[in-house]
């Protein structure tokens, strides 16, 4: 069974507002003023999609916004982002991560190993292209995930919150592989 595409969107907000539109097959952007219900809409859409596609819910990804707690306490936001990023880089137990993907290479055929190495190299190249202006680059070697600068190696949590958020989004999409997927991003 393949994941159903979103063609018609029909979501109720707060039991009084109905949002309806015909969706494009590739990218759709929802815009509105603060408090207009964009985040609520995305949460409701995600829940609806998961309910309809329960067997393939791992192919439906919701990336919530990292709350603007940063204005009040930058440490909380940076910590939440860094923890989320560390999870998708290193977690070996509960979900897809870069390291679990690399470990899967051990039992893979030579052809599968080469394909995975090429995918990781493409991911690295994409991230490095985005980080080029800040003279940072990502290196993925074995179980090491490093951010390299002119002054040496940085821990992931030393990246700016914007850099961590971009890296997290790209990593989540990368971990989906070539599977048909739906990705909902709130305030990228």
PLM features: residue spans?
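Conserved A-loop
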Residues: 19-23
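Walker A (P-loop) phosphate-binding loop of P-loop NTPases
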Residues: 34-35
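N-terminal pre-P-loop "Q-motif" helix
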Residues: 12-15, 165
């Amino acid at each position: 069974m393949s994941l159903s595409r979103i063609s018609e969107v029909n979501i109720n907000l707060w039991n009084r507002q109905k949002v309806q539109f015909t969706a494009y097959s590739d990218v759709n952007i929802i815009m509105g003023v603060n408090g207009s219900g964009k985040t609520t809409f995305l949460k409701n859409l995600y829940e609806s999609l998961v309910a309809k596609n329960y067997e393939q819910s791992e192919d439906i990804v919701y990336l919530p916004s990292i709350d603007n707690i940063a204005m009040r306490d930058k440490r909380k936001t940076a910590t939440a982002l860094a923890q989320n990023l560390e999870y998708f880089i290193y977690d070996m137990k509960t979900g897809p991560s870069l390291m679990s993907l690399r470990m899967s290479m051990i039992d893979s055929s030579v052809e599968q190993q080469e394909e995975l190495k090429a995918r990781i190299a493409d991911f690295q190249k994409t991230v490095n292209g985005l980080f080029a202006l800040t003279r940072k680059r990502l290196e993925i070697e074995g179980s090491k995930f490093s951010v390299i600068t002119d002054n040496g190696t940085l821990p992931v949590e030393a990246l700016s919150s914007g850099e961590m958020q971009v890296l997290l989004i790209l990593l989540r999409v990368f971990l989906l592989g070539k599977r048909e997927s739906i990705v909902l991003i709130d305030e990228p």
